[in-house]
Amino acid sequence: LYNTCTVRENANLKVYGHLGQLKRYKKKNPEMLTMLCGCMMQEQTVVDKIKTSYRNVDIIFGTHNIFKFAELLAMRVFDTSAKKRMIVDVWKDTDAIVEELPIERKYSFKSGVNIMFGCNNFCSYCIVPYVRGRERSREPEEIIREIRELVADGVVEIMLLGQNVNS
C-alpha cells in the first residue's frame, strides 16, 4: 500500500519507479496486491498513466475516500469479477466531509483534530487546491464533539490540523 504525495514531481517519479520494480514480484507472486492512495491519485493524468503503464496495480483510491480502504480490499480479495481488473475509486466531489471515522492515536496524551481540508489560495507553486479540493471546514459541533471525546479519554494536548487553520 503506497500512500502517495504529489507536492513534488520527484515524489511521483519515485512511485513510478517502485511500481516498475514491483512488476517482477507480482509475476512471481500473483496473489500479491499493490494498492495506491493519496494525493497523487487525485490527478486524472496520473491515474490514466498507471492504468495504461502499470497494470500490476490492483487498487487505486484517493484522499477523499480513504475510509473505504477495507471495503475496496475486501472487494478485490473476495469478489471473483474484481480479481481480474484494476479497481479505481477516486472521488472528485471534494465537498463531502465524512465524520465519525475511527481514529488511531500514537500517543495517549496528545492528538490532532482535522478542522478543515483543502485550500483556496491557488499559489503558483502549489498543487494542493487541485488535488485536495477547495477549502472546506468541518462543522464546529463535530470538532467540539471530537475534542470533548479526546479530553474524556485523557488527552491533554490537542493540535488543530488543516492546510490553513486560520481561514
State what each model feature region is:
Residues 2-167:
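Proteins enriched for Cys/Gly/acidic motifs involved in redox and nucleic-acid/cofactor modification
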